[in-house]
C-alpha cells in the first residue's frame, strides 16, 4: 500500500532506501502472533542515501550513502519501503566501493559477528569454533576471526555452505550431518579443544561442552538458539573448567558496545577486508516471494530487495 513520505524529527534523518536486507529473524517477526503493531513495514537492515535531516542534525549528512540497523526493532517502520526515518546514529556511512545491496547485508549479520569477535577477546594465535560458518553471520564471523589472527574450525550442513565457510577462511569445515563434531574438533586440535566457540544454536551446540571441545577457561559466545526456554546445560563442565558463557541479543546492545562494533566494522569496510554475499535480489513488489525464498532455507548469504 501507499504511505505518506515520513519527515524526520529532532536528531533524525530520512533515508531514501535503495536496498532492504531480509534476515531469518524478519521472517520470524512476520510469523509471530499477535503482531506488535497494527501496521508494519518489515525488515531491520537496509541501505540508501540520506535526503532529509531533522533539527539538530548537520546538513553535511544530506547526500551521504549509508547502511542502517534496527529499523524495525520495537517500532513499526522498517526498510521494505522507499523512505525510512531513523535516529541519526542508526544511519552509518557506507564506503563508496560498496553497493547498496552489499550495505543491506550488514546490520544484523555483520554486527552480530563483530560483537561475537569482541566478546571472544584477543584471538591472535588461537583456535575458534564457528558453528554455521557458512551462514550469513558465520561467514562474517569466520572472516573477522581470521583477520584477528585466529585459526577457524567451522561447521556446515551442506557442500555449498562448506564451500562458503572455506572461502571465508576456515581451515577446516565439519559437515555436522555426516560427522560427529566433538570428536572431530578434538582430532583437529590434538585433543586440546578450541579457545572460543561462536555459536548460532545453543540448543544443539551446548551438548559439546561435556565433550570438552572448549578448553578450560575458554569463552563460549551464544547469539542465538533454535529452541529457547529451559535447556539442559552441563553445569559441572561450565564450573569445573571455568567456562566463560557470554550471551547477547544484537538488537539490544548497550550504546557503547554498539559504537565499538560499528567503529571496528567500519574500519574493515573502508579497507575492503570483508566479503559480502548477496544471495538473491528481488524487487519491492516481490517481497512475498523474497520471504518465501528465505523460508526455503536454500539461500547463501542475504536476500535483498532492490527499491
What are these regions (language model features)?
Residues 271-280, 288-307:
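C-terminal capping/lid region of NAD(P)-dependent oxidoreductase domains
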Residues 118-123, 189-190, 212:
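Glycine-rich helix-loop-beta junction characteristic of Rossmann-like nucleotide cofactor-binding loops
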Residues 4-21, 31-72:
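Glycine-rich beta-strand-centered segment in the early N-terminal region that forms part
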Residues 204-274, 307:
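Glycine-rich phosphate-binding loop and adjacent beta-alpha segment
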Residues 59, 69-132:
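NAD(P)H dinucleotide-binding glycine-rich loop of Rossmann-like/cofactor-binding domains
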Residues 181-191:
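Short amphipathic alpha-helix with an adjacent loop that forms part of the alpha/beta core around
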Residues 104-178:
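Mid-domain Rossmann-like dinucleotide-binding core that forms the NAD(H)/NADP(H) cofactor-binding site
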Residues 65, 127, 151, 218-219, ...:
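Short glycine-centered segments of the SAM/dcSAM-binding site in methyltransferase folds
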Amino acid at each position: 500500500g501507499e504511505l505518506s513520505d515520513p519527515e524526520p524529527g529532532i536528531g533524525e534523518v530520512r533515508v531514501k532506501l535503495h536496498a532492504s536486507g531480509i534476515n531469518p529473524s524478519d521472517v520470524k517477526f512476520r510469523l509471530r502472533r499477535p503482531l506488535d503493531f497494527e501496521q508494519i513495514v518489515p525488515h531491520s537492515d537496509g541501505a540508501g542515501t540520506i535526503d532529509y535531516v531533522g533539527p539538530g542534525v548537520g546538513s553535511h549528512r544530506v547526500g551521504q550513502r549509508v547502511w542502517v540497523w534496527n529499523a524495525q526493532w520495537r517500532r513499526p517502520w522498517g526498510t521494505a519501503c522507499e523512505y525510512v526515518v531513523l535516529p541519526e546514529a542508526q544511519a552509518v556511512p557506507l564506503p563508496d566501493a560498496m553497493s547498496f545491496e552489499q550495505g543491506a547485508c550488514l546490520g544484523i549479520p555483520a554486527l552480530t559477528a563483530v560483537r561475537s569477535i569482541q566478546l571472544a577477546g584477543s584471538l591472535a594465535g588461537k583456535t575458534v569454533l564457528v558453528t554455521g560458518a557458512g551462514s550469513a553471520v558465520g561467514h562474517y564471523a569466520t572472516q573477522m576471526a581470521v583477520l584477528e589472527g585466529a585459526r577457524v574450525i567451522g561447521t556446515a550442513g551442506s557442500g555449498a555452505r562448506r564451500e562458503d565457510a572455506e572461502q571465508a577462511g576456515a581451515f577446516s569445515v565439519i559437515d555436522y550431518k555426516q560427522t560427529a563434531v566433538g570428536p572431530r574438533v578434538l582430532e583437529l586440535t590434538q585433543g586440546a579443544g578450541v579457545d572460543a566457540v561462536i555459536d548460532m544454536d545453543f540448543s544443539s551446540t551446548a551438548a559439546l561442552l561435556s565433550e570438552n571441545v572448549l578448553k578450560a577457561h575458554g569463552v563460549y559466545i551464544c547469539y542465538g538458539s533454535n529452541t529457547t526456554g529451559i535447556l539442559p546445560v552441563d553445569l559441572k563442565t561450565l564450573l569445573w573448567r571455568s567456562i566463560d558463557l557470554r550471551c547477547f541479543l544484537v538488537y539490544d546492545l548497550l550504546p557503547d558496545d554498539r559504537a565499538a562494533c560499528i567503529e571496528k566494522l567500519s574500519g574493515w569496510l573502508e579497507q575492503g577486508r570483508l566479503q559480502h554475499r548477496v544471495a538473491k535480489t528481488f524487487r519491492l513488489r516481490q517481497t512475498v516471494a523474497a520471504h518465501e525464498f528465505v523460508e526455503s532455507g536454500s539461500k547463501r548469504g542475504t536476500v535483498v530487495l532492490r527499491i
